[in-house]
């Protein structure tokens, strides 16, 4: 079992109990060094897991870095192209870790569970043969997570709430059409998603291991 999540530094004692009961064995953290230093990480001192830090971006986007976009779709396509360009090797490394993990369940996460995490999830699901419609629907569920994250910030962290309120609202959208466009673009430019991930360092052996491990056999 593989999960995607948002920032796990916010886990409560009850959350950790639930994760122990589910047998969580590994955490893959896709955030930057700065995010971890500022906000913390999964509390491995309280729940020992294999912890892998793979910073997909060197730093998070600042408002001055981001061009003006008229739609959520256009912003997110710009952002996801940037992530794949800058952090493709880290996404490939994450796929390799998932393929060879000693045990599951495991979880991979970033800050909001949407962009870096959403891209890794989309690539993983596509490798496993999941249809695009299901991948896009899974990504769109992040909207529900964003509502919960905003509510948490309002109650627990005025600083985080202010940061979210002052950031471009494109940051918090997850329209399913973005995943459809992205996967179609990868196929147009590289031939297939498999060819794309091969180009960023995912081996044929890793692809086979992921499928063997995570796809249930037909009865």
Show which residues each predicted segment covers.
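Cys-dependent protein tyrosine phosphatase-like superfamily
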Residues: 1-107, 119-219
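Ser/Thr-glycine-rich phosphate-binding loops at phosphate-binding pockets of nucleotides
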Residues: 112, 116-117
């Amino acid at each position: 079992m593989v999960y995607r999540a948002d920032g796990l530094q916010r886990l409560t004692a009850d959350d950790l109990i639930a994760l122990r009961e589910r047998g969580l064995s590994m955490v893959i953290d896709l955030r930057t060094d700065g995010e971890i230093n500022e906000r913390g990480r999964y509390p491995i001192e309280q729940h020992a897991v294999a912890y892998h830090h793979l910073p997909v971006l060197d730093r998070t986007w600042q408002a001055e870095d981001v061009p003006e976009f008229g739609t959520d779709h256009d912003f997110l396509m710009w952002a996801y192209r940037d992530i794949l360009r800058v952090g493709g090797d880290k996404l490939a490394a994450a796929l390799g870790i998932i393929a060879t993990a000693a045990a599951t369940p495991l979880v991979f996460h970033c800050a909001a569970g949407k962009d870096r995490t959403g891209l890794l999830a989309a690539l993983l699901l596509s490798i496993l043969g999941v249809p695009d419609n299901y991948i896009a629907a899974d990504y769109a569920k992040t909207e529900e997570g964003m509502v919960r994250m905003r509510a948490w910030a309002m109650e627990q962290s005025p600083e985080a709430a202010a940061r979210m309120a002052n950031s471009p609202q494109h940051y918090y959208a997850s329209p399913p059409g973005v995943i459809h466009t992205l996967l179609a673009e990868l196929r147009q430019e590289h031939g297939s998603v498999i060819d794309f991930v091969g180009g960023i360092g995912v081996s044929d052996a890793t692809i086979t291991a992921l499928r063997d491990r995570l796809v249930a056999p037909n009865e």
